[in-house]
Structures are given as structure tokens and as C-alpha cells.
Curated annotation (Swiss-Prot):
Transmembrane segments: none
GO biological process annotation, one example: queuosine biosynthetic process
Catalytic activity, EC: 2.4.2.29
GO molecular function annotation: metal ion binding; tRNA-guanosine(34) queuine transglycosylase activity
Gene Ontology CC annotations of this record: cytosol
Protein name as catalogued: Queuine tRNA-ribosyltransferase
Family, similarity comment: Belongs to the queuine tRNA-ribosyltransferase family.
Residues annotated as binding Zn(2+): C306, C308, C311, H337
Assembly behavior: Homodimer. Within each dimer, one monomer is responsible for RNA recognition and catalysis, while the other monomer binds to the replacement base PreQ1.
Residues that hold substrate according to the record: D94, S95, G96, G97, F98, D148, Q191, G218
Pathway participation: tRNA modification; tRNA-queuosine biosynthesis
Lineage: Bacteria, Bacillati, Bacillota, Bacilli, Bacillales
Entry function: Catalyzes the base-exchange of a guanine (G) residue with the queuine precursor 7-aminomethyl-7-deazaguanine (PreQ1) at position 34 (anticodon wobble position) in tRNAs with GU(N) anticodons (tRNA-Asp, -Asn, -His and -Tyr). Catalysis occurs through a double-displacement mechanism. The nucleophile active site attacks the C1' of nucleotide 34 to detach the guanine base from the RNA, forming a covalent enzyme-RNA intermediate. The proton acceptor active site deprotonates the incoming PreQ1, allowing a nucleophilic attack on the C1' of the ribose to form the product.
Designated gene of the protein: tgt
HAMAP family documented for this protein: Q_tRNA_Tgt (MF_00168)
């Protein structure tokens, strides 16, 4: 039996969205679910206790960054990532591939792997499917990701075709190199750019390899949202119904709703934590940029409909002061709020699926959030 399994609870009669439970060695979580990103073994400014309080059920770690610092050997010595960071819930680690392709301009792709330069000190590094598996086995995450090639968007058709074929070959090598399948589930990553036939080919090739779960990669990288939705909708039909489906890099409220409707179960993104550090807050009325002068004497909470720690205790004026003064506590407060907002949104999505009314919920949410249902602007 694989380390991670998917239990289907129901399908929304109105939208076709899925309600399910993903079972892992470190606990189970309901889907659709948003996963906060803890790049360097921490969700920036948040303690594990605070993550539990806002009902985060699963978090991400980043293989590339943890390999470079502090090193997978140190984390293995500590008993794995869960013990190292004192998080007893599920953890998903990415393969390191996205960072290699996005952070390093000086890279050389061969069949063996990718040679590239360290993103800060310029030293020469090499990452292969086997090396990615070794690092992730050392980290001990519940869900590991296969090492894939991430073609830029847009890219020439022939380049993307060769890229997905290499991704499939690398996926086979990942399966062969994976040392702990009884403890850790390895997910395959479907690529294909914005080409429907290549997405289909990539999905079918990877499904033949029988991974315990599948991700859609290479989207949410700057393409218009209608293109992303079209690719998700097309690819979903070739993904197994009895396994988790993970859409990588998606975290805006509108996209979480739209892609839940299109059958996705798991999402991650640095968006809520990254914009929090700039003082941008997600609210039920849309985005709020707390640095704006009009909030200097505004004693209301960030969102009057929110019951998070930040909104129950602090005013816009105070949070604006902290952010303007570059006080760390301000970033903590906006981070707590943004993550709570998205996790509560996912809870609302799951409830709407239970009640067979996700399309109605989408319309209500978009109207309040200031989005046009027919043509949502990029949020």
C-alpha cells in the first residue's frame, strides 16, 4: 500500500469539484486544501503552533534551498524535517527542479541532469533525478515530487515536446532511485506548456508509471489565467480519479476557486506570505494595501468579516505603523491574516462542495471580492 492515499468523499453536483481526504504517515487532511510554503523549513515569521492555530494541515519544504542550507545530511541527522522544524503534520517537498530552472540563468541541461550555478555565490552545482530523490529521502517528507524539466512559458512546441519526453524518462529514474516508498509517496509532475496535446501525452505517459499522486506543473508562471484554467480543465480528464491531484504554484483566491471547480485537490503558493511582507492583505472585499495613507488613523481590523488573531486584536492603523516602521511584528500579523484568509476560503470551498453549491459560492465571493465572474482580472 502506498504511503499516501486518496479517499473520495463526494463530487459537487453543481460544479464537478471533488471533496476528499488525503491520508499520509503524519495525518490526514481534507481537500481541496491550500498548503503554506515553508521554503527553508519555516513558513516565514510563523511558528508551527501558529500554523496549527490557523488550521494549516500540510506545509511545503523546498529541496533546493534545504540542500544548500543547512544541508540534507544535517536534517537527516536531526531525524528528518518533521523533527528538525517541530512540525508533526504532513510535509510535501518539491524536487528542486523549479528553482534550478527559475533562479539560475547559467544552466546546462543534459540527459543526466542539470548543471547550474548557485544563486548567491556562483559555485557550480549538479542536480539529477537520483540526487533529488536522495535529498528528499533524507528530508523524510510525506510527499516527494519527481525531478522534472520546467520549460519556460511560452516555449517552442518542439522544445516542449522534447522536454516532456525527458520529464517522463527522469520520472522513471526517480521511481528507481526512491528508497523509502513505504514511508514517502512520490508524485509525478505533468508538463506540456500551453499545448493541449503535450499535456495529454505527458499525463498519459506518467499515469502508466502508476505514481500514488499527480501534479500539474509549469502553470501559474505568468500566463493569462484563462490559459491556465484551460490547461487544467484539459489535463484533469487524463488524471486518475482515485489519486490526489496537485496544482503547483497557485494561491490567488480566484484561481483556488476556479481550479477546485476544475477538479484539483491541493495547491501551494508563496503569494500570501510574500505579499504580506509588503503590507498587502487579502480581505473579503479584495486586496488592501496597508501602507496607503488613508489607513493611518483607521481603527478597524483588516477585515471585519475575519476571526483571525490579527483581526481580533489589532487595527489597520497599528499594522500600518508597524509595516511603515519595518517592525517584524507587522509582517507576522499580515502573514497570519493572509494564511488564515486562504485556509478559511478553502474551508468555505469544501463546505460549498458538500452543499452542491460551489458555482453559487464562486459568484457570491467574486462579487464581494470585486472580481467580474466572466472575466476575472489578474489578482
Amino acid at each position: 500500500m502506498p504511503a499516501v492515499t486518496y479517499e473520495h468523499i463526494k463530487t459537487c453536483k453543481q460544479s464537478g469539484a471533488r471533496l476528499g481526504i488525503v491520508h499520509t504517515p503524519h495525518g490526514s487532511f481534507e481537500t481541496p486544501m491550500f498548503m503554506p510554503v515553508g521554503t527553508k523549513a519555516t513558513v516565514k515569521t510563523m511558528s508551527p503552533e501558529e500554523l496549527r492555530q490557523i488550521e494549516a494541515k500540510i506545509i511545503l519544504g523546498n529541496t533546493y534551498h534545504l540542500w544548500l542550507q543547512p544541508g540534507n545530511d544535517i536534517i537527516k541527522h536531526a531525524g528528518g524535517l518533521h523533527k528538525f522544524m517541530n512540525w508533526d503534520g504532513p510535509i510535501l517537498t518539491d524536487s528542486g527542479g523549479f528553482q534550478v530552472f527559475s533562479l539560475s540563468n547559467l544552466r546546462k541541461i543534459t540527459e543526466e541532469g542539470v548543471e547550474f550555478r548557485h544563486h548567491t555565490n556562483g559555485s557550480k552545482l549538479f542536480l539529477s533525478p537520483e540526487k533529488s530523490m536522495q535529498i528528499q529521502n533524507d528530508l523524510g517528507s510525506d510527499i516527494m515530487m519527481a525531478f522534472d524539466e520546467c520549460p519556460p512559458m511560452p516555449a517552442e512546441y518542439d522544445y516542449v515536446k522534447k522536454s516532456i519526453e525527458r520529464t517522463t524518462r527522469w520520472a522513471k529514474r526517480c521511481l528507481d532511485a526512491h528508497q523509502r516508498p513505504e514511508d514517502q509517496a512520490l508524485f509525478g509532475i505533468i508538463q506540456g506548456g500551453e499545448h493541449e496535446d503535450l499535456r495529454e501525452q505527458s499525463a498519459k505517459d506518467l499515469v502508466e508509471l502508476d505514481f500514488p499522486g499527480y501534479a500539474i506543473g509549469g502553470l501559474s508562471v505568468g500566463e493569462p489565467k484563462p490559459v491556465m484554467y484551460k490547461m487544467v480543465e484539459h489535463t484533469e480528464q487524463f488524471m486518475p480519479k482515485d489519486k490526489p491531484r496537485y496544482l503547483m504554484g497557485v494561491g490567488s483566491p480566484d484561481a483556488l476557486i476556479e481550479c477546485s471547480i476544475r477538479g484539483m485537490d491541493m495547491f501551494d503558493c508563496v503569494l500570501p506570505t510574500r505579499i504580506a511582507r509588503n503590507g498587502t492583505c487579502m480581505t473579503s472585499q479584495g486586496r488592501l494595501v496597508i501602507k496607503n495613507a488613508k489607513f493611518a488613523d483607521d481603527l478597524r481590523p483588516l477585515d471585519e468579516n475575519c476571526d483571525c488573531y490579527t483581526c481580533q486584536n489589532y487595527s489597520r492603523a497599528y499594522i500600518r505603523h508597524l509595516i511603515k516602521a519595518e517592525e517584524t511584528f507587522g509582517i507576522r500579523l499580515t502573514t497570519i491574516h493572509n494564511l488564515h484568509f486562504l485556509l478559511k476560503l478553502m474551508e468555505d470551498i469544501r463546505q460549498a462542495i458538500r452543499e452542491d453549491r460551489l458555482l453559487d459560492f464562486k459568484e457570491e465571493f467574486f462579487e464581494q471580492y470585486g472580481l467580474n465572474v466572466e472575466n476575472p482580472k489578474n489578482f
